[in-house]
Protein backbone atom coordinates (compact mmCIF):
# COMPACT_ATOMS: atom_id res chain seq x y z
CA UNK A 1 0.00 0.00 0.00
CA UNK A 2 2.90 2.36 0.75
CA UNK A 3 4.27 1.71 -2.72
CA UNK A 4 0.84 2.40 -4.23
CA UNK A 5 0.59 5.75 -2.44
CA UNK A 6 4.05 6.64 -3.76
CA UNK A 7 2.89 5.77 -7.27
CA UNK A 8 -0.25 7.90 -6.83
CA UNK A 9 1.81 10.83 -5.59
CA UNK A 10 4.21 10.54 -8.52
CA UNK A 11 1.36 10.38 -11.03
CA UNK A 12 -0.36 13.36 -9.43
CA UNK A 13 2.74 15.43 -10.07
CA UNK A 14 3.24 14.21 -13.65
CA UNK A 15 -0.07 13.77 -15.42
CA UNK A 16 -1.59 16.50 -17.54
CA UNK A 17 -5.36 16.31 -17.12
CA UNK A 18 -7.40 16.98 -13.99
CA UNK A 19 -10.33 14.68 -13.28
CA UNK A 20 -10.32 14.08 -9.53
CA UNK A 21 -10.64 16.01 -6.28
CA UNK A 22 -9.64 15.05 -2.75
CA UNK A 23 -12.90 13.27 -1.97
CA UNK A 24 -12.70 11.27 -5.18
CA UNK A 25 -9.08 10.34 -4.43
CA UNK A 26 -10.06 9.11 -0.96
CA UNK A 27 -12.81 6.98 -2.49
CA UNK A 28 -10.33 5.62 -5.00
CA UNK A 29 -7.87 4.61 -2.28
CA UNK A 30 -10.66 2.95 -0.29
CA UNK A 31 -11.62 0.92 -3.35
CA UNK A 32 -8.03 -0.24 -3.72
CA UNK A 33 -7.83 -1.15 -0.02
CA UNK A 34 -11.05 -3.18 -0.28
CA UNK A 35 -9.89 -4.95 -3.42
CA UNK A 36 -12.65 -3.50 -5.56
CA UNK A 37 -10.09 -2.24 -8.06
CA UNK A 38 -6.40 -2.89 -8.61
CA UNK A 39 -3.65 -0.35 -7.91
CA UNK A 40 -2.95 -0.15 -11.65
CA UNK A 41 -6.59 0.61 -12.44
CA UNK A 42 -6.61 3.33 -9.81
CA UNK A 43 -3.36 4.85 -11.04
CA UNK A 44 -4.64 4.85 -14.62
CA UNK A 45 -7.79 6.73 -13.57
CA UNK A 46 -5.92 9.61 -11.97
CA UNK A 47 -5.09 12.49 -14.30
CA UNK A 48 -3.73 15.47 -12.40
CA UNK A 49 -0.94 17.88 -13.14
CA UNK A 50 0.69 19.88 -10.37
CA UNK A 51 0.13 23.26 -12.02
CA UNK A 52 -1.10 24.95 -15.18
CA UNK A 53 1.44 27.36 -16.65
CA UNK A 54 -0.15 30.53 -18.03
CA UNK A 55 3.14 32.38 -18.45
CA UNK A 56 2.21 35.16 -16.02
CA UNK A 57 0.96 32.64 -13.43
CA UNK A 58 1.39 28.99 -12.52
CA UNK A 59 -2.03 27.94 -11.28
CA UNK A 60 -1.75 25.34 -8.51
CA UNK A 61 -4.28 22.76 -9.65
CA UNK A 62 -3.14 20.25 -7.03
CA UNK A 63 -3.57 22.35 -3.88
CA UNK A 64 -6.95 21.01 -2.82
CA UNK A 65 -5.53 17.49 -2.78
CA UNK A 66 -2.61 18.58 -0.61
CA UNK A 67 -4.34 21.03 1.70
CA UNK A 68 -8.07 20.49 1.36
CA UNK A 69 -8.64 23.98 -0.07
CA UNK A 70 -8.03 25.16 -3.61
CA UNK A 71 -5.80 28.07 -4.60
CA UNK A 72 -7.03 31.56 -3.75
CA UNK A 73 -6.49 34.47 -6.14
CA UNK A 74 -4.94 37.55 -4.53
CA UNK A 75 -6.36 40.30 -6.70
CA UNK A 76 -4.30 43.29 -5.65
CA UNK A 77 -1.45 44.17 -8.03
CA UNK A 78 -2.80 41.80 -10.67
CA UNK A 79 -4.35 43.18 -13.84
CA UNK A 80 -7.99 42.46 -14.53
CA UNK A 81 -6.93 40.37 -17.51
CA UNK A 82 -4.60 38.28 -15.34
CA UNK A 83 -7.35 37.65 -12.80
CA UNK A 84 -9.76 36.59 -15.53
CA UNK A 85 -7.12 34.32 -17.03
CA UNK A 86 -6.47 32.57 -13.73
CA UNK A 87 -10.21 32.17 -13.14
CA UNK A 88 -10.59 30.59 -16.55
CA UNK A 89 -7.77 28.15 -15.90
CA UNK A 90 -9.24 27.14 -12.55
CA UNK A 91 -12.68 26.58 -14.07
CA UNK A 92 -11.11 24.39 -16.74
CA UNK A 93 -9.75 22.29 -13.88
CA UNK A 94 -13.30 21.84 -12.54
CA UNK A 95 -12.91 24.09 -9.49
CA UNK A 96 -16.35 24.42 -7.92
CA UNK A 97 -15.72 27.58 -5.91
CA UNK A 98 -13.11 30.26 -6.58
CA UNK A 99 -12.21 32.91 -4.01
CA UNK A 100 -10.65 36.22 -5.08
CA UNK A 101 -9.37 38.59 -2.38
CA UNK A 102 -8.46 42.29 -2.56
CA UNK A 103 -10.36 42.64 -5.81
CA UNK A 104 -10.99 46.13 -7.15
CA UNK A 105 -14.34 47.22 -8.53
CA UNK A 106 -12.75 47.66 -11.96
CA UNK A 107 -11.44 44.10 -11.96
CA UNK A 108 -14.77 42.80 -10.66
CA UNK A 109 -16.71 44.49 -13.46
CA UNK A 110 -14.33 43.02 -16.04
CA UNK A 111 -14.45 39.48 -14.66
CA UNK A 112 -18.24 39.66 -14.25
CA UNK A 113 -18.57 40.16 -18.01
CA UNK A 114 -17.12 36.68 -18.52
CA UNK A 115 -18.06 34.69 -15.43
CA UNK A 116 -20.82 34.54 -12.84
CA UNK A 117 -19.15 36.63 -10.13
CA UNK A 118 -20.54 37.48 -6.70
CA UNK A 119 -18.65 40.60 -5.60
CA UNK A 120 -18.73 42.42 -2.27
CA UNK A 121 -17.14 45.86 -2.51
CA UNK A 122 -16.80 46.37 1.25
CA UNK A 123 -14.59 43.32 1.76
CA UNK A 124 -13.23 43.36 -1.82
CA UNK A 125 -14.06 39.66 -1.99
CA UNK A 126 -15.10 38.02 -5.24
CA UNK A 127 -16.63 34.54 -5.35
CA UNK A 128 -17.24 32.45 -8.45
CA UNK A 129 -19.22 29.23 -8.21
CA UNK A 130 -21.40 27.63 -5.59
CA UNK A 131 -21.07 28.22 -1.87
CA UNK A 132 -20.53 24.90 -0.07
CA UNK A 133 -22.85 23.50 2.55
CA UNK A 134 -21.96 24.26 6.16
CA UNK A 135 -19.62 21.45 7.21
CA UNK A 136 -17.61 22.97 10.06
CA UNK A 137 -17.87 21.48 13.53
CA UNK A 138 -19.32 24.60 15.12
CA UNK A 139 -19.51 28.38 14.78
CA UNK A 140 -16.79 30.91 14.08
CA UNK A 141 -17.30 34.29 15.74
CA UNK A 142 -15.91 37.39 14.04
CA UNK A 143 -15.76 40.39 16.38
CA UNK A 144 -14.55 43.93 15.71
CA UNK A 145 -13.54 46.74 17.99
CA UNK A 146 -15.20 49.36 15.81
CA UNK A 147 -17.26 49.91 12.69
CA UNK A 148 -14.11 51.01 10.86
CA UNK A 149 -12.73 47.48 11.21
CA UNK A 150 -15.64 45.89 9.34
CA UNK A 151 -13.97 45.72 5.88
CA UNK A 152 -11.24 43.49 7.32
CA UNK A 153 -13.84 41.56 9.32
CA UNK A 154 -15.93 40.90 6.23
CA UNK A 155 -12.86 39.60 4.42
CA UNK A 156 -12.38 37.15 7.30
CA UNK A 157 -16.05 36.22 7.57
CA UNK A 158 -16.60 35.67 3.85
CA UNK A 159 -13.42 33.62 3.59
CA UNK A 160 -14.64 31.37 6.39
CA UNK A 161 -18.05 31.05 4.76
CA UNK A 162 -16.53 30.06 1.42
CA UNK A 163 -14.93 27.12 3.23
CA UNK A 164 -18.19 25.89 4.69
CA UNK A 165 -18.33 27.54 8.10
CA UNK A 166 -21.18 29.12 10.01
CA UNK A 167 -20.09 32.64 10.97
CA UNK A 168 -21.54 34.88 13.67
CA UNK A 169 -20.70 38.57 13.35
CA UNK A 170 -20.27 40.80 16.43
CA UNK A 171 -19.39 44.25 15.15
CA UNK A 172 -18.50 47.40 17.11
CA UNK A 173 -18.01 45.70 20.49
CA UNK A 174 -14.70 47.35 21.41
CA UNK A 175 -13.27 48.21 24.81
CA UNK A 176 -14.55 51.80 24.71
CA UNK A 177 -17.91 50.30 25.66
CA UNK A 178 -17.36 46.93 27.35
CA UNK A 179 -21.08 46.46 27.99
CA UNK A 180 -21.56 45.92 24.25
CA UNK A 181 -19.25 42.91 24.31
CA UNK A 182 -20.63 41.55 27.58
CA UNK A 183 -24.09 41.57 26.07
CA UNK A 184 -22.85 38.76 23.79
CA UNK A 185 -21.01 36.72 26.41
CA UNK A 186 -22.96 33.55 25.58
CA UNK A 187 -21.91 33.82 21.94
CA UNK A 188 -18.28 34.27 22.98
CA UNK A 189 -18.36 31.32 25.36
CA UNK A 190 -19.98 28.97 22.83
CA UNK A 191 -17.70 29.69 19.87
CA UNK A 192 -15.26 27.14 18.52
CA UNK A 193 -12.94 29.82 17.13
CA UNK A 194 -13.02 33.60 17.55
CA UNK A 195 -11.48 36.16 15.23
CA UNK A 196 -10.89 39.42 17.13
CA UNK A 197 -10.26 42.40 14.86
CA UNK A 198 -9.22 45.80 16.14
CA UNK A 199 -7.17 48.87 15.32
CA UNK A 200 -6.12 51.65 17.69
CA UNK A 201 -4.37 49.88 20.62
CA UNK A 202 -5.80 46.45 19.70
CA UNK A 203 -7.06 45.60 23.20
CA UNK A 204 -10.10 43.63 22.05
CA UNK A 205 -8.14 40.43 21.41
CA UNK A 206 -6.78 40.32 24.96
CA UNK A 207 -10.20 40.98 26.48
CA UNK A 208 -11.83 38.21 24.47
CA UNK A 209 -8.86 35.92 25.04
CA UNK A 210 -9.32 36.31 28.78
CA UNK A 211 -12.95 35.14 28.58
CA UNK A 212 -13.09 32.49 25.86
CA UNK A 213 -12.10 28.82 26.13
CA UNK A 214 -11.34 28.49 22.42
CA UNK A 215 -8.54 29.72 20.11
CA UNK A 216 -8.59 33.46 19.45
CA UNK A 217 -7.11 34.74 16.20
CA UNK A 218 -6.19 38.40 16.55
CA UNK A 219 -6.16 40.68 13.52
CA UNK A 220 -4.62 44.13 13.96
CA UNK A 221 -5.98 46.74 11.58
CA UNK A 222 -4.49 49.94 10.25
CA UNK A 223 -7.36 51.96 11.77
CA UNK A 224 -6.14 54.68 14.11
CA UNK A 225 -4.32 57.96 14.54
CA UNK A 226 -0.63 58.83 14.11
CA UNK A 227 1.03 56.67 16.77
CA UNK A 228 -0.97 53.70 15.54
CA UNK A 229 1.70 53.57 12.81
CA UNK A 230 -0.62 51.94 10.28
CA UNK A 231 -1.54 49.08 12.61
CA UNK A 232 1.87 48.48 14.17
CA UNK A 233 0.75 49.52 17.65
CA UNK A 234 -2.20 47.10 17.52
CA UNK A 235 0.06 44.36 16.17
CA UNK A 236 2.58 44.74 18.99
CA UNK A 237 -0.17 44.91 21.60
CA UNK A 238 -1.72 41.69 20.33
CA UNK A 239 1.64 39.93 20.12
CA UNK A 240 2.28 40.85 23.75
CA UNK A 241 -1.15 39.75 24.97
CA UNK A 242 -1.19 38.27 28.46
CA UNK A 243 -4.22 36.16 27.57
CA UNK A 244 -3.44 32.55 26.71
CA UNK A 245 -4.60 31.07 23.43
CA UNK A 246 -4.28 34.26 21.37
CA UNK A 247 -2.45 34.03 18.04
CA UNK A 248 -1.86 36.93 15.67
CA UNK A 249 -1.89 37.35 11.90
CA UNK A 250 -0.59 40.25 9.86
CA UNK A 251 -2.06 43.76 9.79
CA UNK A 252 -5.41 43.86 7.94
CA UNK A 253 -5.07 40.17 7.04
CA UNK A 254 -8.70 39.14 7.29
CA UNK A 255 -8.20 36.39 4.74
CA UNK A 256 -5.45 34.73 6.76
CA UNK A 257 -7.58 34.80 9.89
CA UNK A 258 -10.63 33.37 8.13
CA UNK A 259 -8.60 30.61 6.50
CA UNK A 260 -6.94 29.58 9.76
CA UNK A 261 -10.22 29.70 11.65
CA UNK A 262 -11.75 27.40 9.05
CA UNK A 263 -8.92 24.90 9.42
CA UNK A 264 -9.41 24.85 13.20
CA UNK A 265 -13.17 24.48 12.85
CA UNK A 266 -12.74 21.43 10.62
CA UNK A 267 -10.31 19.59 12.90
Task: State each model region's role.
Residues 1-19:
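Short, Lys/Arg-enriched N-terminal segments with co-localized hydrophobic residues
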Residues 19-104, 109, 113-115:
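Long amphipathic alpha-helical segments
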Residues 118-122, 208-232:
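Short, acidic/small-residue loops that bind anionic groups at enzyme active sites
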Residues 137-177:
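Glycine-rich phosphate/diphosphate-binding loop of Rossmann-like nucleotide-binding domains
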Residues 223, 227-267:
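C-terminal binding/interaction regions
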Amino acid sequence: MIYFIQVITRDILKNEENAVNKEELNNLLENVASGAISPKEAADSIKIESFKDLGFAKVDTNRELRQGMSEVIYGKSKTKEQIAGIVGAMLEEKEKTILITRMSREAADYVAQQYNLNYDELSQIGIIGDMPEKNGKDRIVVATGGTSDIPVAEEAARTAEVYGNEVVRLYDVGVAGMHRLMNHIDTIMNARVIIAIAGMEGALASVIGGMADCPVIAVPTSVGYGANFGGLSALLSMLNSCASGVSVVNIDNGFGAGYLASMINHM
